Amino acid sequence: MSIRAKRRKRASPTDLYRTCKQAGTCPPDIIPRVEQNTLADKILKWGSLGVFFGGLGIGTGSGTGGRTGYIPVGSRPTTVVDIGPTPRPPVIIEPVGASEPSIVTLVEDSSIINAGASHPTFTGTGGFEVTTSTVTDPAVLDITPSGTSVQVSSSSFLNPLYTEPAIVEAPQTGEVSGHVLVSTATSGSHGYEEIPMQTFATSGGSGTEPISSTPLPGVRRVAGPRLYSRANQQVQVRDPAFLARPADLVTFDNPVYDPEETIIFQHPDLHEPPDPDFLDIVALHRPALTSRRGTVRFSRLGRRATLRTRSGKQIGARVHFYHDISPIGTEELEMEPLLPPASTDNTDMLYDVYADSDVLQPLLDELPAAPRGSLSLADTAVSATSASTLRGSTTVPLSSGIDVPVYTGPDIEPPNVPGMGPLIPVAPSLPSSVYIFGGDYYLMPSYVLWPKRRKRVHYFFADGFVAA
């Protein structure tokens, strides 16, 4: 007997309408029911065009009789009247102003009426008497002092118990004009000295720079650009315009352009730059000065825009453009010569050669003519300088000709290295057998036969040693 599958209840029309309306997969009876477009709804719509049933409540509603409900014929609906307290008029509360006191007094102050001055009492019967004068000249007052010099005296005192820094001001310079002295009021005595200020360094700013800045709590090291990274392409620029006008190598000159440290280039279409090394360059960052292999190098990092995606993003490699400004010379130490320089003006009689006359005379007779460039002793004069010894010594001055160079300084004798004779090859030695006679012979510890190992047979003498 097969078990019949349980039938699942379909969802409500409202839930089905929410999910299948946008996808367009609704059953044919869902949309008319939810949108009230069934056959019954259409009959009511068409019938209501010619028949009006008023408030009878005939429709597809809940059957409660409409908004007012069912009432008997010939009567009126009851009206619920709510009887409550009589409403009071609102009381306007006036806020207290800033000049009004915060404490309200219960008893008002009595007003004081000032009576004023008393009326004058007249004793005469004719009223006031008017006095007249016949003098018509105006009165002139002489305010000129009798003396010709002006004397000004002042006194000041200092109260140590009271000091007001906000009021104390430096006295201003007085102005004297004729006999009139105009001065400013001072508070106490002040001693000061006017020192002219001198500007040592000026900057080419616009004058709107801030006077001071907030100091940093510590020194922060700014990391330099990684110019020689593997991700950067190294390009050497030989044009010196790269130092001051790098934009001229990417685009042509624009007189309206305002240079900055980081230069951004906008290329709407393909173009040919003045320098082919700067092809597809869209940005050149701030310059940097470095020392590289003994030279001062001016560097800038650039970014290419080789590819452009549909979203407008540019993709390209980073390029390191550099220009070597000047080489850095090696540090040279100032060397001082230990001996004075040679003088070629008078080089005669620089060295004296001493020899015995008995030995020198036979050598001079047998000496052949000296070749060019050698030392000649035949033309020199022989004179005895000492007669105190058995054999007299003769002074022979050294003649310096044009072909014989003469140098001053100590005599240096090179070492006498004897020459090496011919080398005789040694006959190769033949290996010979070594015979050991004895009974004490031990193997090396590494060659000891341990149990559970294969047997080893040693045939060489080097695998063991002889007991002494």
From Swiss-Prot:
| Alphabetized Pfam families for the sequence | Late_protein_L2 (PF00513)
Gene Ontology BP terms? microtubule-dependent intracellular transport of viral material towards nucleus; symbiont entry into host cell; viral penetration into host nucleus
Q: Would you tell me the Gene Ontology cellular component terms?
A: host cell; host cell endosome; host cell Golgi apparatus; host cell nucleus; viral capsid
Keywords, comma-separated and alphabetical: Capsid protein, Cytoplasmic inwards viral transport, Disulfide bond, DNA-binding, Host endosome, Host Golgi apparatus, Host nucleus, Host-virus interaction, Late protein, Microtubular inwards viral transport, Phosphoprotein, Viral penetration into host nucleus, Virion, Virus entry into host cell
Disulfide bridge partners, by residue number:
C20-C26
Localization, per the record, is: Virion; Host nucleus; Host early endosome; Host Golgi apparatus
Q: Which domain of life is it from?
A: Viruses
Signal peptide extent? none
Name the record gives this protein? Minor capsid protein L2
**What is the species of this protein?**
Human papillomavirus type 2a
